[in-house]
């Protein structure tokens, strides 16, 4: 599943394609959304926001399209009039004079009013987004030490969107390698230096992954230039200590780590 950096890059692509342009055609697959088709003609997308792995497309009439891709959903940008070559099932079409954005295969799609946006169950449940530039290491440290999270093992905590939105398995793996910790640690057991390093890594690594999107290399995760240190590198040498990277399972997800320098 794409993680926060990949979702944010997708949002950037959607914004670049249609932001500020009048919508000339709107289509929704789900019957409960069809009533909004005529309401959106002539309106425009003001911005596309991410909350972890959810995407919020905001319109000029104050409506917001909520979508969560889950495992299978994908957004695509095409020239208006062009057919997208795919066997996926189309769920949403937002068309402007020159560009059209298409959402395929997703099932978690809703239209929200401003009031509903503030009370949506998923949006209320998720924690601060790691790509939010206003989120600081100090705030992350406070969350790590809060009664709600301080006794949680990192193996599960770093996958919990209620802790920090936008983290996922590859980020969990890379963050813990960066700070030299295994997944069985808890925030309450760390010393001040470890806690500080973890708080910074929880923001620095997702933001670096997002920022290095300039070129595409299909051999790297979701086309990002972000280079894995341990993820999917089991059996290879650790570049930090020369140990052999191993693969195991933590919180029902594959976990990659170096026994030589992660303790």
UniProtKB/Swiss-Prot annotation:
Catalysed reactions listed for this entry: 2'-deoxyribonucleotide-(2'-deoxyribose 5'-phosphate)-2'-deoxyribonucleotide-DNA = a 3'-end 2'-deoxyribonucleotide-(2,3-dehydro-2,3-deoxyribose 5'-phosphate)-DNA + a 5'-end 5'-phospho-2'-deoxyribonucleoside-DNA + H(+)
Zinc finger (FPG-type) stretch: 229-263
Transmembrane residue ranges: none
UniProt cofactor(s): Zn(2+)
Alphabetical list of CDD domains matching this protein: EcNei-like_N
Enzyme Commission number(s) from the entry: 3.2.2.-, 4.2.99.18
Function of the molecule: Involved in base excision repair of DNA damaged by oxidation or by mutagenic agents. Acts as a DNA glycosylase that recognizes and removes damaged bases. Has a preference for oxidized pyrimidines, such as thymine glycol, 5,6-dihydrouracil and 5,6-dihydrothymine. Has AP (apurinic/apyrimidinic) lyase activity and introduces nicks in the DNA strand. Cleaves the DNA backbone by beta-delta elimination to generate a single-strand break at the site of the removed base with both 3'- and 5'-phosphates.
Protein's name in the database: Endonuclease 8
Origin species: Escherichia coli O157:H7
Encoding gene per record: nei
